[in-house]
A protein has these predicted regions:
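Amphipathic alpha-helical interface segments
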Residues: 1-110, 115-117, 126-130, 145-147
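Phosphate-handling active-site elements
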Residues: 12-16, 111, 122, 152-165, ...
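Short, hydrophobic/aliphatic alpha-helical segments
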Residues: 22-23, 80-81, 118-137, 269-281
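Glycine/serine-rich anion-binding loops at beta->alpha junctions
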Residues: 133-143, 147, 285-291
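Short, small-residue alpha-helix embedded
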Residues: 141-152, 293-304
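Conserved glycine-rich phosphate/nucleotide-binding loop
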Residues: 151-192
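Cysteine-based protein phosphatase catalytic domain of the PTP/DSP
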Residues: 194-280, 301-334
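A phosphate-binding catalytic loop at a beta-strand-loop-alpha-helix junction
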Residues: 279-297
């Protein structure tokens, strides 16, 4: 049931995905019901990636007609039950039911940016529900997480979790994200041509430095954590320093930052967590003109109890060239009115 990577390889070909899902399942679980479950879940993941919708039923047409009604009933039961009701969740059928139950029965929060509540919190809440169902929790959570991540995107994963996330052998979060990007053939080389600036201290917290990407070549004294708001090449990562990537795109387009308010808030929570650990933080983007000032302003607003726009004035006092794009400014007003 850990079939999400299969989906990425066949996003543009539903028929090929159905065939691949069943063949991969057959490698270890030759029971046709195991193949059915993988087909259903793979098609649900594909649909979620392409549309953002959560629907476990759309793949029923690809299930043998003799078992189709049975699977429909099983999904009905999942939606009427709690994950903990599926005691035999090491079996693929009940594992799928437990995962779908956690997703379907966990309410999607109503967005309230100023209160720090977001609809994408559904990913975190539903995964918590899946784990608390008990028994074979890693399987159920892996199944649920594949679909939730497909619907909400990597930017909906809390930074606190991303700091812990890892793969084998020795893969960190950024490595796993890069692997997924390569599977969908979206990886492209990149470089930056900027005029380097001198890092400056945050006006409301001298343990936070604001900088451009060039600062990675020579960190300010004492910096032991880096929060990157732009893409960073592996070769540019400073040695011996924890680095956390944040997906924040400096473009004013509807699909550029689907989870913008959450990402800004979550990044500020990350900085607060790092500071509470006694870390000195470097916050940077490419040129320190739009993304970094925005996050720095949200951080200042939260720590000082002021409006976002007033906090931004403080940021521009140390970064005169700061000018967050219009979407970022609107988000700043929503998050810290």
């Amino acid at each position: 049931m850990r079939t999400a990577p299969v989906v990425l390889a066949h996003l543009d070909d539903e028929a090929a995905l159905v065939e691949a899902a069943r063949k991969v399942s057959d490698l270890t679980h030759y029971d046709p019901e195991a193949g059915d479950a993988c087909v259903l879940w793979c098609l649900a993941i594909r649909h979620a990636i392409l549309t953002g919708e959560l629907d476990a039923r759309l793949g029923l047409q690809h299930i043998d007609i003799d078992r189709r009604n049975l699977w429909s009933t099983r999904l009905d039961v999942a939606e009427a039950s709690q994950p903990s009701d599926f005691k035999n969740n090491g079996w693929v059928v009940e594992a799928l039911q437990g995962a779908w139950s956690a997703i379907a029965r966990t309410p999607v929060p109503q967005d309230d940016p100023a209160m720090g509540v977001f609809s994408v919190d559904h990913l975190r809440l539903a995964l918590n529900t899946a784990v608390r169902g008990g028994k074979d929790t890693d399987t159920v959570a892996a199944i649920a997480g594949g679909l939730l991540g497909a619907a909400y995107g990597a930017s909906a994963i809390p930074a606190e979790w991303r700091r812990l996330l890892h793969g084998w052998p020795g893969l960190a979060t950024r490595d796993l994200a890069a692997l997924a990007t390569r599977i969908v053939k979206a990886d492209k080389p990149f470089s930056y041509d900027i005029e380097p600036m001198a890092p400056v201290r945050h006006p409301h917290d001298d343990g936070v430095w604001l900088a451009d990407v060039a600062a990675l070549q020579g960190l300010p004294p004492g910096v032991d954590a880096v929060v990157s708001l732009c893409r960073v090449n592996d070769d540019d990562l400073p040695a011996g320093v924890e680095q956390i990537d944040v997906r924040l795109i400096d473009r004013v387009e509807p699909d550029a930052n689907p989870n913008l308010d959450f990402v800004l808030t979550d990044t500020v929570r990350l900085i607060e967590q790092l500071r509470n650990e006694g870390r000195t933080v470097l916050l940077h983007c490419v040129a320190c003109q739009s993304r970094t000032p925005t996050v720095a302003a949200v951080y200042g607003a939260r720590t000082q109890g002021m409006s976002g726009m007033l906090a931004l004035q403080g940021i521009t006092s140390v970064l005169p060239g700061a000018w967050p794009n219009s979407d970022f400014q609107k988000a700043l007003e929503r998050l810290a009115p």
